Amino acid sequence: MNLSTRVMLNRLTQQCVYKRIVTFSTKTAEHVIENQEEQKKEAPPTTPTSPVNRKTIIPANYRFVYPEFLPDPKVEWRNLVREKLERLDMLDRRKQIDLPEFYVGSVLAVTSSDPHAAGKTSRFVGICINRDRCGLRARFILRNVIDHQGMEVVYELYDPTILKIEVLRLEKRLDDSLFYLRDALPEYSTFDENMEAEPLEEGAPVPVNDIKVVLRPRPWLERWERQNLRGVANIDEYLKDKHRLSAAKVQKPWEKYDMMKDYRSSIPEEEQTEIFAEVHTELHALELQRKRNKRKRTFIKPKQLA
């Protein structure tokens, strides 16, 4: 074989040799891309799924049941660190004593330690005429008429000397405060010290007592005709023309449209939700424990007959 034929054979072999060897177990890149495009066409379009909302559901009545957990709306009195620490102390106190749900107009019995009493404890029964302040300084006032004398006791809700709070009658009134009972007839503020608790069905709404009290003749402790009270029946009987004119002069009918005043005198809903979300777990656990204790049947040993 001469030199020219060898050169021709080498050129033919170089042209016939494959540049890449493909085995039976592999596929080319072009084939893989084609298969992926076919799968995309055949697959149905997927809709984007929204993330599951796992936020805690806070009952809407928390701001009425636990009003002391909401801070004071005055900006100059706000301190976020102090408020958070106070809420922790309030929860710790609620773990030590059962602080039930009550409103202005409910009849309560409060047992507190008293170093001057015979048994070192004292018990007072009365109607709640006011609730004010917030945090650890939350307080309420009970009123009762004993021996024809009006008696009022101011209790701090988180006072460590309070041993027990019982709700004898759970109800609301038409007004936010009942200070006018001081000028009303004594029968509207008289309650038996041995009064038994009136049970209310579990889950039932709190009843609203729409009774209208009768005031005694003037002079009064306050000018009740200027306060737009709904729970008083006979204010007009003791008013003269000069009283009506003076009451009309101090009226401010535009305040119900003042949105800025409402904003400055209340806590925004977003902040309320954030505060109650912080304490919801502990409060819910305490509510369940209170319900379990309420359902327990206490065994009373019968007295032996003579």
Curated annotation (Swiss-Prot):
Asked if Mitochondrion is a keyword of the record, the answer is: yes
Principal subcellular localisation of the protein: mitochondrion
Q: Cellular location of this protein?
A: Mitochondrion
| UniProt signal peptide | none
Which is an annotated Pfam family here? Ribosomal_L19
Q: Which Gene3D superfamilies match?
A: 2.30.30.790
Q: What's in the GO CC field?
A: mitochondrial large ribosomal subunit
- Report keywords, A-Z: Mitochondrion, Ribonucleoprotein, Ribosomal protein, Transit peptide
Q: Which GO terms describe its biological process?
A: mitochondrial translation
GO terms (molecular function) for this protein are:
structural constituent of ribosome
* Record InterPro entries: Ribosomal_bL19, Ribosomal_bL19_sf, Translation_prot_SH3-like_sf
Tell me its family: Belongs to the bacterial ribosomal protein bL19 family.
Protein name listed in UniProt: Large ribosomal subunit protein bL19m
